[in-house]
Amino acid sequence: SLGSPAVAEPAVIAE
């Protein structure tokens, strides 16, 4: 959600 820092988010990041 936030972008790079996966804070309380699933392992799926915008990378």
From Swiss-Prot:
Domain of life where this protein originates: Eukaryota
GO cellular component: extracellular region
Major subcellular location class: secreted
Localization per Swiss-Prot or TrEMBL: Secreted
GO biological process, one term: positive regulation of cell division
Molecular function as annotated in GO: growth factor activity
Record keywords, A-Z: Developmental protein, Disulfide bond, Growth factor, Mitogen, Proto-oncogene, Secreted
Function of the molecule: Growth factor that plays an essential role in the regulation of embryonic development, cell proliferation, cell migration, survival and chemotaxis. Potent mitogen for cells of mesenchymal origin. Required for normal proliferation and recruitment of pericytes and vascular smooth muscle cells in the central nervous system, skin, lung, heart and placenta. Required for normal blood vessel development, and for normal development of kidney glomeruli. Plays an important role in wound healing. Signaling is modulated by the formation of heterodimers with PDGFA.
Sequence similarity: Belongs to the PDGF/VEGF growth factor family.
Assembly with partners or alone: Antiparallel homodimer; disulfide-linked. Antiparallel heterodimer with PDGFA; disulfide-linked. The PDGFB homodimer interacts with PDGFRA and PDGFRB homodimers, and with heterodimers formed by PDGFRA and PDGFRB. The heterodimer composed of PDGFA and PDGFB interacts with PDGFRB homodimers, and with heterodimers formed by PDGFRA and PDGFRB. Interacts with XLKD1. Interacts with LRP1. Interacts with SORL1 (via the N-terminal ectodomain).
The protein's name in its UniProt record: Platelet-derived growth factor subunit B
Source species: Sus scrofa (Pig)
